[in-house]
Amino acid sequence: MIEMKTFSAGWISEILLRNYVMGTIFFSLIHIPLYVSKSQGIKFKFNPNWPEKIQKLFTFNKQIFDNLFWSLFWGVPIWTAYEVISLWLYASGKIPFIQFSESPIYFFLILLLIPAFRDAHFYLVHRVLHFKFMYKIAHSVHHRNINPGPWSSLSMHPVEHLLYFSGVIIHWIILSNPLHAIYHLFHAGLGSANGHIGFKQMLLNDKHAIDLSNYNHYLHHKYFEVNYGNLMIPFDQWFGTYHDGSDELHQKMLVRFTKASN
């Protein structure tokens, strides 16, 4: 990490390239079989319709071009910026970090808690993004994707990217390790696919399939004002905004919407 004590184009460009390659491979491995070759048709697809060929709502009039633009032009660079700043802070000694050999139990504990912290951070940020002003200037870009696909995952306005990836700042505050910060950002960057793939499962063959997507978040894209969080911490159950697709909770949602409009 010695070279990371100062900002330089060399190591920064290496991290940016790595994130571009990893992100592109990851999302493409899901997108191509499901949305290009359509290897399983609409089997296990939440929305039986495919994205329209021409969609004036989207940048460049097409959902996939829109998603690629916001993800690659803004998403990956902002993800990388947070990683670069984190590594520079560690390498320059501006924040301390713990080695695995010093406290392996604490090291693993932080690693295990990152998904839970991300769940809480995502819920809080997501509620803020649904404030009228924030939705208008930023979050509306992401919510164009009523029928999301894998590349919709990081298709966000840069203001939303800044908030979405800001959870890594916790590692600037608590004692952790550069690997924790990197894992945290990968969990946010690649983990964003959960809930945006649009399919419950991907078929491997006639007998086997792998679970893919979070129906909970698909319903958020469909109804907007439900399921602000994920499922690890039940914030939506606690605050009355949960929807699981059942008729009972759908009716509760409609009643809530009616009250809010009066």
What residues fall within each predicted segment?
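Non-catalytic, topology-defining segments of multipass membrane proteins
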Residues: 1-129, 137-140, 145-166, 229-232, ...
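Alpha-helical transmembrane segments of multipass membrane proteins
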Residues: 84, 165-173, 189-190
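Helix-capping/transition residues at the boundaries of transmembrane alpha-helices
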Residues: 129, 172-175
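Alpha-helical and His/Cys-centered functional microenvironments
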Residues: 130, 143-147, 200, 221-224
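Functionally important transmembrane alpha-helices
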Residues: 174-231, 238
